Amino acid sequence: MALRLYNTLSGEKEPFVPRVAGKVGMYVCGVTVYDFCHIGHARAGIVFDMIYRYLRFSGYDVTYIRNYTDIDDKIINRANQEGTDYRTIADRYIATFDEDMDRLGMLRPTIEPKATDHIEDIISIIQRLIDNGHAYAVDGDVYFAVETFPAYLKLSGRNLDDMLAGARVDVDERKRNPMDFALWKGSKPGEPWWESPWGKGRPGWHIECSAMSMRFLGPSFDIHGGGKDLVFPHHENEIAQSEGANGCQFVKYWLHNGFVNINSEKMSKSLGNFFTIREVLELFDPETLRFFILQAHYRSPLDYSDQNLREAQAGLSRIYEALAALDQALEKPATAIHLPASAAEFAEKVAGLLPRFREAMDDDFNTAQALGTLFDSIRTLNRLLAEGGGSSSASRADLEQLRAAVTEIGAVLGLFRIKPSDWLAAREAEKARHLEISPEEIEGLIVERAAARKNKDFKRSDEIRDYLLSRDIQLVDTPQGTAWKVK
């Protein structure tokens, strides 16, 4: 089936028809660079990296823009706290963000603009809004007049009158309407500023994204993404100011990923349940975090806990164990591969894997279902390899086809990037760190056991095996040698 995606604007799944056939323009709101990124940022990054990869896999020429908000109240406050310049703070946390994204296996977007590089674009749009009657200047500030834009709140589905009635908005007598939002903020002592027709000042947050997206994608483009928390006010305000300035539809499809909860509670600094990406990666490898995030549909809430991460790592290990067995089987000569003569089920699973993967991904990027199809094939593979039986050259072709399909799926999801034996060895080493025995000692005992067996000293061989078992180390003898794993 053709790609369908859930559009926040309509509240429905819609067929994906880009404005220009074969080309996609996609803008995703990046981070405000004043601190280390948390796992909510990791989810947004991984989700839209997956979408970017799948669109390219589907044959689209994608221009992917993700910005840095490098001027904002939070950045200024952090700079003042540290007694430094806002640019020092922004540059520091741009660098740490890039490091985090690289560790999580992200593809770099086509362009990663900084807000401060587009001040002239921002001023131009604000002036156009004033000229169009959608904005007004007062005492060096410029505000968007929400009542001049009848479609305001069309993305979130809120009602302006209801919001005004129950508003917790600080009353500013200079505003025509309490819901009017800042496009330009007049300078205050100790703050960075730029010259403008309304005096020295700096841009508001919302106008920055409109300016950067329009600069690289034009006044109207295909996909705008971000976290669910950005629907209001950020994306709502982007629509108002962009369509008010240009007189045309700003974005065709709005995509929003769900929240991350911590042990079933919403993640927040005030609750003290706030984890940075770096803190998580001290406990779990990057691919496990990526796999954990992709196990859920991108719009669903995601409950983060150490237990859920451990379960995700166990699931990823099952795939890597199957891939290691598959690679081992494919290293044998074709005539040495023994598979059940009744391997028709496996052949059917393999032939259908990529089509079923595409079907799941075409259904609003349903990675949960897509991974389910992969696990289905892996289970059949494990059963097949365990049974043994007759041999077939066609069965080898099925194994090769499965390996190629998993590699292709991995490229779309950003998974299975590591040699299976290396990944499994790293996980065993992690487990061994919590044992009273080192990997080096284990390997030394394996060498000693091999020598004992060669010399037919089976008593010593059994003693070594039993000793390791008492330390929760299980030995696995294979034609290629002896491996070990933590029980």
From Swiss-Prot:
Binding site for ATP: 269
InterPro entries according to UniProt: Cys-tRNA-ligase, Cys-tRNA-synt_Ia_DALR, Cys-tRNA/MSH_ligase, Rossmann-like_a/b/a_fold, tRNA-synt_1_cat_dom, tRNAsynth_Ia_anticodon-bd
Catalytic activity: tRNA(Cys) + L-cysteine + ATP = L-cysteinyl-tRNA(Cys) + AMP + diphosphate
Signal peptide range in chain numbering: none
Protein keywords: Aminoacyl-tRNA synthetase, ATP-binding, Cytoplasm, Ligase, Metal-binding, Nucleotide-binding, Protein biosynthesis, Zinc
Residues that bind Zn(2+): 29, 209, 234, 238
The UniProt record lists the keyword Repressor: no
GO BP terms: cysteinyl-tRNA aminoacylation
Span(s) of short sequence motif 'HIGH' region: 31-41
Note on cofactor: Binds 1 zinc ion per subunit.
Motif ('KMSKS' region): 266-270
EC number: 6.1.1.16
GO cellular component: cytosol
NCBIfam families, per database record: cysS
Protein name: Cysteine--tRNA ligase
Source species taxonomy: Bacteria, Pseudomonadati, Thermodesulfobacteriota, Desulfuromonadia, Geobacterales
